[in-house]
Amino acid sequence: MLTERQLLILQTIIDDFIGSAQPVGSRTLAKKDAITFSSATIRNEMADLEELGFIEKTHSSSGRVPSEKGYRFYVDHLLAPQNLPKDEIVQIKDLFAERIFEAEKIAQQSAQILSELTNYTAIVLGPKLSTNKLKNVQIVSLDRQTAVAIIVTDTGHVQSKTITVPESVDLSDLEKMVNILNEKLSGVPMSELHNKIFKEIVTVLRGYVHNYDSAIKMLDGTFQVPLSEKIYFGGKANMLSQPEFHDIHKVRSLLTMIDNEAEFYDILRHKQVGIQVKIGRENSATAMEDCSLISATYSIGEEQLGTIAILGPTRMQYSRVISLLQLFTRQFTDGLKK
């Protein structure tokens, strides 16, 4: 159990190192307003913290830096919530204030905004479309031979496809077909739509739509959806701006992993509900052993729909990142309920 004095010194060392990226010595600590102990006392406490494994010496400096154990203790016990600037809160809320909530578009923009606000790499795993439910279908006629089929899901995903209208299908038939599809299919999971249309709805259309076989073939492919989630990155090269990663040889494997994307898909799709913080070698990938990954899930009720994550150095602004992720996931979840 650390003493109050040790807790204060450890927190001050980590806060200073996060901000400066420079090893922290006893002289630096002695100049802090919150530290009122003598230099000798500070040195003794630092020696104890080093012996306990919370801080460690670097080869290039007499100062100390946090260890993975130190960061973990800091995140679990010392972290205080950070109030975000009002302009950032407004910027984030404006993103989610769109009249039509398109989850994919929001996910893509979220990754970009988060990377800009943190200067780290942001990763957003979008909702899995196959679990979405159909909200409604629209068919908008462009001319006599061309129309656009628009599908809207319960999460706001909008999918459109240009279709060719056969000469044997008139506009009144299209209108009847849309009404039947909306009546019979609203609330049906996207993964079940294709089979339901071509095995069940066809018999209903037969009684109301002339040349129903031509009409239904016209929609073939419109209701096919990708089975896996889309993954969006923002600031892929941001890690290069961090002092820890100025050595390109050190960061090459990480950049390769980021560029490949598939590994992050596997990491994020199995995330537990809530805020998760993985520090250094707690991450399963060797390329991430000098990084921290903070992730948060967004959901509707009990159904987890996606994950937002920030990848940065272990010297990450943990409090700020967690506050940002909490705001984003809250806004994302509220938007999906619209």
Swiss-Prot record:
InterPro entries per record: GAF-like_dom_sf, HrcA, HrcA_C, WH-like_DNA-bd_sf, WH_DNA-bd_sf, WHTH_transcript_rep_HrcA_IDD
Role summary: Negative regulator of class I heat shock genes (grpE-dnaK-dnaJ and groELS operons). Prevents heat-shock induction of these operons.
GO biological process: negative regulation of DNA-templated transcription
Protein name: Heat-inducible transcription repressor HrcA
Gene: hrcA
Keyword Iron (UniProt): no
Protein keywords: Repressor, Stress response, Transcription, Transcription regulation
Record GO terms (molecular function): DNA binding
Species name: Bacillus thuringiensis (strain Al Hakam)
Similarity-based family: Belongs to the HrcA family.
